[in-house]
């Protein structure tokens, strides 16, 4: 198998992987970063969301070959001011119920606040539409995003 070079969370990785292997499985099985979750395998639930060059991307349908030379950030590598505000708001407002979808939710919310520091409810709903929460904590997710935005603007 060909060797694929990746930069994940600021670290260079060389992995032996078929170029069509989804990034999700390379992150989890080859690199050992299990915070990114498998939910549906067809980019419909958002559990597999990572950042690629600062944009939210579904890793379950992204071939690892499409990522060569690009910057990948997983939930384990988040460290921006917006990410810290989102994580704090998630804890403060008790957003998590079962927790399975939360890494994807946090990844999407972080990109939203990095691009739009004062989102409206509509902005939040649009940005988070690709993330499904089977426990239906959507109201708490929206409240946490507003709280994180307020913290960032303080």
What residue spans do the PLM features occupy?
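Signature of N-terminal electron-transfer/Fe-S-associated modules in redox systems
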Residues: 1-154
């Amino acid at each position: 198998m060909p060797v694929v070079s990746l930069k994940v969370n600021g670290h260079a990785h060389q992995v032996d992987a078929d170029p069509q292997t989804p990034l999700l499985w390379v992150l989890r099985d080859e690199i050992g970063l299990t915070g990114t979750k498998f939910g549906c395998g067809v980019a419909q639930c958002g559990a597999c969301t990572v950042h690629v060059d600062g944009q939210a991307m579904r890793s379950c349908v992204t071939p690892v070959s499409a990522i060569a030379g690009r910057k990948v950030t997983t939930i384990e590598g988040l460290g921006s001011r917006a990410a810290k505000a989102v994580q704090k708001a998630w804890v403060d407002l008790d957003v998590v119920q079962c927790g399975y979808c939360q890494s994807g939710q946090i990844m999407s919310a972080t990109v939203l606040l990095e691009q739009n520091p004062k989102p409206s409810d509509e902005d939040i709903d649009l940005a988070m539409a690709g993330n499904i929460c089977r426990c239906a904590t959507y109201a708490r997710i929206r409240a946490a995003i507003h709280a994180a935005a307020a913290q960032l603007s303080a």
